[in-house]
């Protein structure tokens, strides 16, 4: 049905200029709006005057000859849509449809031989009529998925049952992809993928399962599904920077990647490097980082030669100003190091530990703490020990300086433990680095003293010249005074 909510312009007009300036007032207004939107408007198209539904006989009471025709009649009856924004209209018809949908779900779940070829058309029509619609822009242009409550679909009492029915249909032992492919085609899948932008997380969860089932059963649609997901992500990265269903699509991709045959195709490697790695730059990374990191690690477990370009890609996009994202990147790096091969580790140890050294030195204690936790990982410790000659010189200066200067006592304690571990790995190198570090510090202190001494002399010289100038001016004044007196 058409939305009864006010247009976005009217909503924004309700916020005064002073409220826009005052962030606290603005937030309270947004909170009030959020509460009003807890049940969002149904996005279904208006059908004009509604047809009143009348209950059909129960399927279980019909004879076997009548059941198939009655099944199709019920499917057709459920194509009629209702306005859930009007809580008092069509109550009887809404309840009849809800009960009918429940009955259809149970019917296909508990009976064999009911999904016959002639029923496929009516089944897909009913599903399409109920779930496919144009999703409107968010009611709140300042919507923050991490803070704000999503707009829930008002007609969920019916849509939920349609999704339940769809899943039972796809999972039925009687389901035949060879027949269904006439109706579940590229256009159908494209519309399904567009629904992943729904704000309602309940709907996205159903869509995730439905798309996964379709991918598994329709071999001819697999390449198309991957391509369309690729397009959605590219649009998300480079154009809109907004899509509600990124986490769900990545979750599906995780299992798809897991099933890729070896050797990996060039298109799959390109997807990793051109789509998944650049996705780390997204503002809302926290909403889908766990699923994104899982996909990346799945690729590396499939093909270890991808490790170097992946880590170099992450280092290229390393956050400069967002500590929360740095912590996420460090977590992902640890997941990658958990599956890395020693030969691949040697290729990236220098640039990687230069970045880890910077993170350890971070004034943000969570970033420093997350980087230092690498030394709690037994496998990473073994890799460090094998390559201690390269890694210790990179890390030493930062660690030693932090042990003396960091503001957070927890970080200082962690650094002492790391230094102790590194010293046990190679005591001689550790002592050499300690001596050279102290010597360097002495040289720096000496230079600093020399600089201070030089500035002191310059100040004295400046003062001396100023006094000389002042005396010269005084003497000239005296001479002129004496001359005029004579």
UniProtKB/Swiss-Prot annotation:
Ranges of Basic residues compositional bias?
A: 27-37
UniProt modification remark: Phosphorylated on serine residues.
Is Nucleus tagged as a keyword? yes
| Residue(s) carrying Phosphoserine | 41-42, 49
Keyword annotations for this protein?
A: Acetylation, Centromere, Chromosome, Cytoplasm, Nucleus, Phosphoprotein
Q: In which tissues is it expressed?
A: Widely expressed with the highest expression in heart and skeletal muscle.
Report the residues modified as N-acetylserine: 2
GO molecular function: any one?
protein phosphatase regulator activity
Name the InterPro entries for this protein.
Answer: ARM-like, ARM-type_fold, PP2A_B56
Q: Which domain of life is it from?
A: Eukaryota
Its biological function?
Answer: The B regulatory subunit might modulate substrate selectivity and catalytic activity, and might also direct the localization of the catalytic enzyme to a particular subcellular compartment.
Write down what this protein is called.
Serine/threonine-protein phosphatase 2A 56 kDa regulatory subunit alpha isoform
- What is the originating organism of this protein? Homo sapiens (Human)
Source gene? PPP2R5A
């Amino acid at each position: 049905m058409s939305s009864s909510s006010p247009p976005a312009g009217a909503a924004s007009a309700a916020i005064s200029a002073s409220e826009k300036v005052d962030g606290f007032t603005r937030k309270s207004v947004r909170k009030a709006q959020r509460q009003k939107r807890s049940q969002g408007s149904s996005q279904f198209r208006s059908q004009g005057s509604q047809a009143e539904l009348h209950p059909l006989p129960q399927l279980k009471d019909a004879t076997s000859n009548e059941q198939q025709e009655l099944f199709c009649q019920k499917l057709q009856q459920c194509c009629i849509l209702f306005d859930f924004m009007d809580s008092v209209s069509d109550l009887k018809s809404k309840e009849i449809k809800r009960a009918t949908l429940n009955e259809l779900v149970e019917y296909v779940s508990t009976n064999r031989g009911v999904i016959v070829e002639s029923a496929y058309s009516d089944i897909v029509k009913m599903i399409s009529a109920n779930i496919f619609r144009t999703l409107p822009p968010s009611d709140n242009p300042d919507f923050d998925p991490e803070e704000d409550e999503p707009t829930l679909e008002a007609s969920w009492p019916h849509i939920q049952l349609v999704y339940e029915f769809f899943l039972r249909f796809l999972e039925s032992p009687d389901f035949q992809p060879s027949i269904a492919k006439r109706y579940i085609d590229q256009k159908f899948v494209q519309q399904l993928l567009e629904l992943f932008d729904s704000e309602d997380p309940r709907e996205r969860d159903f869509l995730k399962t439905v798309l996964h089932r379709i991918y598994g059963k329709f071999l001819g649609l697999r390449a198309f599904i991957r391509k369309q997901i690729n397009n959605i992500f590219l649009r998300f990265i480079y154009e809109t920077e907004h899509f509600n269903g990124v986490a769900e699509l990545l979750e599906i991709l995780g299992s798809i990647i897991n099933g890729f045959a070896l050797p990996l195709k060039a298109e799959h490697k390109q997807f990793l490097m051109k789509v998944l790695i650049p996705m780390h730059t997204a503002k809302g990374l926290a909403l889908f980082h766990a699923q994104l990191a899982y996909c990346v690690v799945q690729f590396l477990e499939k093909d270890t030669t991808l490790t170097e370009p992946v880590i170099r890609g992450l280092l290229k996009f390393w956050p400069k100003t967002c500590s929360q994202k740095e912590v996420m990147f460090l977590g992902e790096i640890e997941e990658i190091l958990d599956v890395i091969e020693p030969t691949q580790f040697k290729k990236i140890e220098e640039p990687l530990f230069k970045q880890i050294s910077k993170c350890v030195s971070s004034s943000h204690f969570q970033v420093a703490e997350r980087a230092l936790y690498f030394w709690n990982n037994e496998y990473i410790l073994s890799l460090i020990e094998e390559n201690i000659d390269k890694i210790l010189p990179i890390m030493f200066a930062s660690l030693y300086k932090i042990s003396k200067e960091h503001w957070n006592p927890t970080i200082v304690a962690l650094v002492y433990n790391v230094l102790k571990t590194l010293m046990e790995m190679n005591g001689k190198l550790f002592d050499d680095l300690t001596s050279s570090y102290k010597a360097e510090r002495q040289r720096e202190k000496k230079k600093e003293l020399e600089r201070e001494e030089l500035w002191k002399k310059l100040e004295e010289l400046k003062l001396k010249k100023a006094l000389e100038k002042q005396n010269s001016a005084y003497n000239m004044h005296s001479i002129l005074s004496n001359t005029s007196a004579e």
